[in-house]
Regions:
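Signature of Gram-negative outer-membrane beta-barrel scaffolds
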Residues: 2-125, 140, 145-150, 252
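Transmembrane beta-strands of outer-membrane beta-barrel pores
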Residues: 3, 71-73, 82-88, 134-140, ...
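Outer-membrane beta-barrel translocator domains and adjoining extracellular loop/strand segments
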Residues: 5-14, 88-97, 143-151, 193-202, ...
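Residues on the lipid-exposed face of transmembrane beta-strands in outer-membrane beta-barrel proteins
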Residues: 63-69, 82, 118-122, 170-174, ...
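Gram-negative outer-membrane beta-barrel transporters
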Residues: 187-189, 207-314, 427-429
Length: 430
């Protein structure tokens, strides 16, 4: 507890659960071992720990092997790795919702991991080269996604397995007197992916813990880089990336609301949802002047296809059925019609830098000024997320859903790039 905002103490109880259980019910306690003499929860003061207290322990061992050889114009490499991952949770509080499954050490999750990768490059002559890379890997899930609700209990996520990753890349390089070029394409496929989120779920007036499992993902794209040597001191570079990073199927979901001790299973209709908060298309042009100790660079960058983090709760099967055809959750044929993922606004950004190196009698002085977003374009979205709040309310008597006055889906949280900003760096070497 950092600041009680004027209060003297705070009861260590689950305030979300008070709407479901009475204040004296042990299930509202965050720690049954410190409920106090009246059973109202330990009094928390500034500097105390409350709500949850746990440690996640990970033990990992890896062994690598690598072999490389050059035969004429062919250079190739083969590498392999095997590993072992062990993880478990140690709870320092006995949660009232999970009295027998929150304090102490959890069960262990063990994963045998490993993978192989290879790369081959053929020199074709005349500055041309062709490369191919392939890889396959079994990777243990991250510890921060392995537990279903770590703030409340020791449960691991159901269907927790190694992620399986196939990767491939094909590239062409050219190096000449006035031009250097690189063209590459890649395709990666992942299965058994597990993702985890926790957030305040307005529909249930509760904090919620969401685990999505059995996910499949595709990552693919093309990249082009050109470097033109216009003169001995002037270069022009053109860079372009078009990529795709999205879910290939609808995920299984299990979630727990902090007002109850029961899990809910469903399908989240998140197929074709994209990776968030990164531009999937980037195009750049850079002009560089380097002469007589001067360094001047002017860079123009265009960013596009920037998606916000999607809210799984808006795409649960149960949510779409509740919305029905009247509120757009299903079409007339009974097919689910989940929301499209919210996309942020891209745009153009101009950056510049100028520097000078001076050689002195007893050292050297380097001065560099960098200015970002020279045109002060603050309309570019750098990231954000959809609100996990539905656009309807449900009549508890009739079960009918009606539209809310405020449309949460159309008003997501967005982050924007900073306006014009700069940095001056002065370094003296001796």
């Amino acid at each position: 507890m950092e600041d009680l905002l004027g209060a003297k103490s705070f009861h260590n109880i689950n305030t979300y659960a008070l709407g479901t259980y009475a204040a004296a019910d042990p299930r509202v306690q965050y720690d049954l071992n410190t409920t106090g003499t009246l059973g109202l929860g330990k009094l928390v003061y500034e500097g105390d720990t409350f709500g949850y207290d746990y440690n996640i322990n990970v033990r990992r061992a890896k062994l690598w092997a690598n072999y490389a050889q050059t035969i004429g114009k062919l250079h190739y490499m083969v590498a392999g790795r095997v590993g072992y991952d062990n993880m478990y949770r140690v709870g320092n509080m006995r949660n009232g919702m999970f009295a027998d499954n929150s304090a102490g050490k959890s069960k262990d999750a063990n994963f045998l991991t490993g993978g192989v990768k290879s790369n081959a490059t053929v020199t074709l002559g005349g500055g041309n080269a062709l490369s191919l890379g392939l890889g396959y890997e079994h990777r243990a899930p991250n510890a921060n996604t392995a537990f279903a609700s770590p703030e409340m209990n020791n449960d691991f996520v159901l269907n927790l397995h190694n992620e399986r990753i196939f990767s491939s890349e094909l590239s062409y390089q050219y190096s000449g007197s006035w031009l250097r070029a690189n063209l590459s394409g890649y395709y990666n496929h992942m299965t058994n992916v597990t993702e985890w989120q926790n957030f305040y779920f307005d529909d249930a007036n509760s904090f919620t813990y969401v685990s999505m499992t059995n996910m499949k993902k595709n990552y693919y794209g093309i990249e082009l880089g050109l470097d033109f040597k216009l003169t001995s001191f002037l270069n022009f570079k053109a860079l372009g990336t078009w990529s795709e990073a999205k879910n290939a199927n609808n995920a299984d979901v299990i979630y727990l609301n902090s007002t109850k001790s029961t899990y809910n299973k469903d399908i989240v209709y998140n197929k074709n949802m994209h990776e968030a908060s990164t531009p999937l298309s980037v195009y750049s042009a850079i002009l560089s002047y380097h002469k007589g100790g001067w360094f001047i660079d002017l860079s123009g960058n265009y960013y596009d296809r920037i998606y916000l983090s999607y809210a799984p709760s808006l795409r649960y099967g149960n949510t779409l059925r509740t919305m029905g055809t009247a509120l757009g959750g299903m079409d007339a044929n009974g097919n689910y019609t989940p929301y499209a993922q919210t996309e942020g606004h891209g745009g153009f950004m101009l950056d510049a830098s100028i520097g000078k190196s001076l050689y002195l009698r007893h050292g050297s002085l380097s001065i560099n000024l960098m200015i970002t977003n020279l045109l002060n374009n603050q309309k570019i979205v750098s990231g954000g997320y959809e609100q996990g709040r539905s656009n309807y309310t449900v009549n508890k008597t009739t079960g009918a859903a009606t539209t809310r006055a405020y449309d949460f889906y159309r008003n997501p949280k967005k982050y924007y790039v900073n306006g014009i900003n700069g940095m001056l760096n002065v370094a003296y070497k001796f």
